[in-house]
Every structure is written in C-alpha cells, then in structure tokens.
A protein has these predicted regions:
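Short beta-strand segments enriched in hydrophobic/aromatic residues
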Residues: 27-29, 41-43, 82-84, 97-99, ...
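Flexible, solvent-exposed coil segments and beta strand-coil junctions
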Residues: 1-7, 17, 51-61, 94-100, ...
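Electropositive, surface-exposed helix/loop patches at the edges of structured domains
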Residues: 20-28, 205-212
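Transmembrane beta-strands of outer-membrane beta-barrel proteins
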Residues: 24-26, 36-40, 77-79, 92-96, ...
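Outer membrane beta-barrel strand-and-loop segments of large Gram-negative receptors
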Residues: 8-14, 20, 26-27, 34-93, ...
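Gram-negative outer-membrane beta-barrel proteins
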Residues: 1, 31-33, 43-51, 86-90, ...
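A general structural signal for short secondary-structure junctions and capping/turn motifs
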Residues: 15, 25-28, 158, 197-199
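Conserved C-terminal beta-signal and adjacent last beta-strands/turns
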Residues: 109-237
Length: 237
C-alpha cells in the first residue's frame, strides 16, 4: 500500500459459513393502526479478517488475511403505522436495536439504536412529508470495521393531479460539509479512521416532475410519497 504498509495474499483462506433467521409478528388492533415486531439474526463463521504483522525487521507492517473470526448480528425492532383524519394524516416510526458481536482476532461488541420516523399530510391535490433517520452504525465483519454515517432529514411538498406529479424535496438543509461516514479499524499493531465523502448527506434540493400515461392498462395512482399502509417489515442492510 505504501513504504510502511505491504500487502500479501493467503492461499489457505477457507469459505465462511453463514446462518440467517427471521421472525415477524403483525398486530392490527384497529383499521387505522398497525404494528409489527421483528427480529433478525445473521451469523458468519470462519470468516476472513485483515491481520497485521511486523515486516522488514519491524520497519513496516504486512497486511494479510486469515480465517479467524465469528460474526453475529441481531436486530430487534418495532414498526408502527397510524392513520388519522380519514387517512389524510399518516404517522410512521420504526425503532430498532442492533446487537453486534465479533470474536477471534478482533473482539468487538456494539449495541447501536436507530429509529426512522415520518409524518405525511394530504390536502386535496397536495401532500407534505417530514422524515428523520438516525445515523446508521454497523460492524462490518470481513473488514473488522466500525462504520457510522450521518443522520438524515428531509421535508417534501408535492402536487398530484390528472397524471401529473410535481415534487420538491429539501434534504439535510442545515449541513454544509461533505462527510458521509467514518470507518474505524482497531488492531493490536495498526489502527485507522477513514472519512468517507459524498453528497448523499449534504444539503440539497430535488425537483421532480412526472406524468403518467393511462394507456392500455389501468394505472392506479396515489401513494406519491410512499404512503404507509398496513404493517411493514424490515430488511437488514
């Protein structure tokens, strides 16, 4: 990589074994309210991870990979959806907790909390939405990296009629920097923190104008802003 860091391969690397399990329970006590409990597990065994050893008499480091690690990721959460005022107001929230555990060459334990929320209001042909998402914090197994991005918030206003849909979205309007995430690696001989740039978490305005042609097949319009309906599930990323 540079004069202080060299890299080598490992022909003895083995394939890892993976296990995935999912559980979900939906509860709809009223027509305008629904909730979902979900739990998900992902395990990876004998995964390869980066290892660092002294090189050239300790003047540099040699980066390689070894099959030495076990990775566990469990997510437990709830999803709520509430419709008010004849479905003109829709509220949604999805709080969840992750349990990360990594053993072997790296000993990592993290328990981050996250929540996604949104509120949508429909007024005749107009619709408005506000949404917020906490930073995502994950442990990336094969890289032994702790990853944390930024929180995300947006305001949306739109108009839809006769096949036309015009939407204006204001995203992260109070954030002027271009930092998207941080990645941290800690090992006995080497540690690093990387800043990941990008425009996804930077402030911006998006304007969208679309027109739907009702030809040949009946087209169902509506749900312009991802209207919440029924109980939602979640997928781990």
């Amino acid at each position: 990589l540079n004069e202080l860091m060299y890299q080598t391969g490992n022909p003895d690397l083995k394939l890892s074994r993976q296990v995935t399990a999912n559980m979900q329970y939906n509860w709809i006590p009223r027509r305008n309210f629904s909730t979902t409990f979900f739990a998900q597990y992902f395990g990876e065994y004998d995964l390869y991870v980066p290892v660092f050893t002294p090189y050239d008499g300790g003047k540099a480091l040699l980066r390689g990979y070894d099959t030495d690690g076990t990775y566990h990721r469990t997510q437990v959460g709830l999803s709520f959806n509430l419709h008010l005022a004849g479905n003109k107001i829709q509220l949604a929230a999805q709080p969840s907790v992750y349990f990360y555990r990594m053993t072997g060459h790296y000993d990592i334990s993290k328990t981050p909390f996250s929540i996604h929320t949104s509120a949508t209001f429909y007024l005749n042909d107009f619709y408005f939405q506000a949404s917020y998402q906490t930073p995502e914090r994950t442990v990336q197994g094969n890289r032994a990296v702790y990853y944390k991005d930024r929180d995300f918030y947006q305001l949306l206003a739109g108009w839809s009629k006769c096949g036309w849909n015009v939407r204006l979205t204001a995203i992260n309007m109070f954030r002027s920097d271009w930092i998207g995430a941080t990645q941290t690696l800690n090992s006995p001989l080497y540690s690093e923190t990387r800043l990941v740039g990008g425009n996804y978490f930077h402030r911006r305005l998006n304007l969208s104008v679309t027109y739907t042609l009702n030809y040949g097949k009946k087209v169902q319009q509506g749900n312009e802003v991802g209207e919440q309906s029924g109980a939602a599930s979640a997928i781990m990323k």
